[in-house]
Amino acid sequence: MPEGPEIRRAADKLEAAIKGEPLTDAWFAFPQLQPYQSLLIGQRVTHIATRGKALLTHFSGGLTLYSHNQLYGVWRVVDAGEQPASNRVLRVRLQTARKAILLYSASDIEMLTAEQVAHHPFLLRVGPDVLDMTLTVEEVKARLLSAKFRHRQFSGLLLDQAFLAGLGNYLRVEILWQVGLSGKRKAAELSDSQLDALAHALLAIPRLSYHTRGQADDNKHHGALFRFKVFHRDGERCERCGGVIEKTTLSSRPFYWCPGCQH
């Protein structure tokens, strides 16, 4: 599954295609969204935000299109007027004079006012997004130490979107390797310096993955263009301590780690 950095890069591509340009056409497959088609003509997409796997497409008139790709949804960028052949079912088309963005196969799509965005059940459940560049290390450390999260094992916590949105399995194992921690540790057990290192890595590693897009590397996953230290490297030597990287299952997902230097 693509994780936060890959979803943010997808949002960047959509923004590059249509952001700031007047919409010449808007089309929705779902009847409850069709009344908005004429209303959006002439409006502009001001920005596209991400919260975990949800995209929030903000329009100049104040409305926001909420979409969650779940397992099957996918966005495409095409030239204006282009109707690409696809076995997928088209759900959304937003077009300017130059480009169009198309959403296929997704079923979780809503048009929201600002107040509805603020009270949306999914958005209330998820934590701050690791690719939100206003999120600070201090805020992440405070979440780690909160009563809700301080006694949770990292193996599960780092997959819980209520803790931080945008993390997933490859980020989970790379973050824990970076700070030398086992997936069975908890924030309540850590020293202050360990907490600082973990809070920093929880932001730095997803952002490194995001910012290093475009660098060729065969050792990648869903476009995560930075070199993995442990993910999918079981049986290889750890570059830090020379131990052998192992694979197990934690929180129902494959977990890669080095027993020699992760404690």
Curated annotation (Swiss-Prot):
* UniProt cofactor(s): Zn(2+)
Q: Cite the Gene3D superfamilies for this sequence.
A: 1.10.8.50, MutM-like, N-terminal
Give one GO molecular function term.
zinc ion binding
Residues the entry annotates as binding DNA? Q70, R125, N169
What keywords appear on the UniProt entry? DNA damage, DNA repair, DNA-binding, Glycosidase, Hydrolase, Lyase, Metal-binding, Multifunctional enzyme, Zinc, Zinc-finger
Its name, as the record gives it, is Endonuclease 8
Please describe what this protein does: Involved in base excision repair of DNA damaged by oxidation or by mutagenic agents. Acts as a DNA glycosylase that recognizes and removes damaged bases. Has a preference for oxidized pyrimidines, such as thymine glycol, 5,6-dihydrouracil and 5,6-dihydrothymine. Has AP (apurinic/apyrimidinic) lyase activity and introduces nicks in the DNA strand. Cleaves the DNA backbone by beta-delta elimination to generate a single-strand break at the site of the removed base with both 3'- and 5'-phosphates.
| Similarity remark | Belongs to the FPG family.
- EC numbers listed for it are 3.2.2.-, 4.2.99.18
Pfam families linked to this entry: Fapy_DNA_glyco (PF01149), H2TH (PF06831), zf-FPG_IleRS (PF06827)
What residues make up the catalytic site? Answer: P2, E3, K53, R253
- Species assigned in the record: Klebsiella pneumoniae (strain 342)
| Cofactor comment text | Binds 1 zinc ion per subunit.
Quote the gene name from the UniProt entry: nei
Question: Quick one: a GO biological-process term for this protein?
Answer: base-excision repair
Record's catalysed reaction(s): 2'-deoxyribonucleotide-(2'-deoxyribose 5'-phosphate)-2'-deoxyribonucleotide-DNA = a 3'-end 2'-deoxyribonucleotide-(2,3-dehydro-2,3-deoxyribose 5'-phosphate)-DNA + a 5'-end 5'-phospho-2'-deoxyribonucleoside-DNA + H(+)
